[in-house]
Amino acid sequence: MQQSTNVDPQEIAKFERMAETWWDLNGEFKPLHLLNPLRLNYIDQTAGGIFGKKVLDVGCGGGILSESMARIGAVVDGLDMGEEPLEVARLHALETGVSINYVKNTAEAHREDHREYYDVVTCMEMLEHVPDPQSVIQACCDMVKPGGFVFFSTINRNIKSFVETIIGAEYLLKMLPIGTHDHNKFIKPSELMALVDNTDLLCKDALGITYNPLTGIFKYTPKVDVNYMIATQKVD
């Protein structure tokens, strides 16, 4: 059964329109392709390796992170509410020979049959696109096994993030389509930590990611003032 209460139709439609360019390395999702190796390494290293582990990728879109995790041996389920991105993800997985189970569903509905089922849950660049981030975080917590890891990434809400991710990335550098992000939906680290504290997850680490437009390279940074990730672990 699919649940649609925590879905923003405008957000779904936005990514449906861009779906066909998901795997174009120089297209609208180029930043995600550049960013993905950092995300994958952080997840794999922090979780003590994901080879052979059951992993759920919440808000998987066209499957960039899902595929990379499957390639290093994870057993991956990809979850999204966009039909077009999921079709792109399924087709690309067929073309590359990667085995991934893609499902159209919300995290809340998927939870009903998958409580404490996964070793690792990822929810990357997704929380800022849903009406109720707390609901998604709780669902992720419920689906991971005790002792398992849940990873979140989002964007801080401040003047610097507005300048870099909207004025810079969308309007000046044209790295993203205009309207991709809504600054009001960005989440401060303190706010995300408070949401996590309402669950059985404990924050184990936080790490920022910065982009150099001159070199076109993303790299880790201890500063969480714009893009950042957190690693949480479920209380055993």
UniProtKB/Swiss-Prot annotation:
Query: Which keywords accompany this UniProt record?
Result: Methyltransferase, S-adenosyl-L-methionine, Transferase, Ubiquinone biosynthesis
Membrane-crossing ranges are none
Give the EC number(s) under which this enzyme is classified.
2.1.1.222, 2.1.1.64
For this protein, what reaction is catalysed? Answer: a 3-demethylubiquinol + S-adenosyl-L-methionine = a ubiquinol + S-adenosyl-L-homocysteine + H(+); a 3-(all-trans-polyprenyl)benzene-1,2-diol + S-adenosyl-L-methionine = a 2-methoxy-6-(all-trans-polyprenyl)phenol + S-adenosyl-L-homocysteine + H(+)
Q: Where does S-adenosyl-L-methionine bind?
A: 39, 59, 80, 124
Q: Which GO terms describe its molecular function?
A: 2-polyprenyl-6-hydroxyphenol methylase activity; 3-demethylubiquinol 3-O-methyltransferase activity; polyprenyldihydroxybenzoate methyltransferase activity
For this protein, the record's Pfam families field holds:
Methyltransf_23
CDD domains for this protein: AdoMet_MTases
Its EC top class is: transferase
Pathway(s) it belongs to: Cofactor biosynthesis; ubiquinone biosynthesis
Q: Name one GO biological process term.
A: methylation
Do you know which HAMAP family this protein is assigned to? UbiG
Q: Which NCBIfam families does the record associate with it?
A: UbiG
Q: What function does this protein fulfil?
A: O-methyltransferase that catalyzes the 2 O-methylation steps in the ubiquinone biosynthetic pathway.
In which family does this protein belong, per the annotation?
A: Belongs to the methyltransferase superfamily. UbiG/COQ3 family.
Q: What is this protein called?
A: Ubiquinone biosynthesis O-methyltransferase
- Give the species this sequence originates from: Shewanella sp. (strain MR-4)
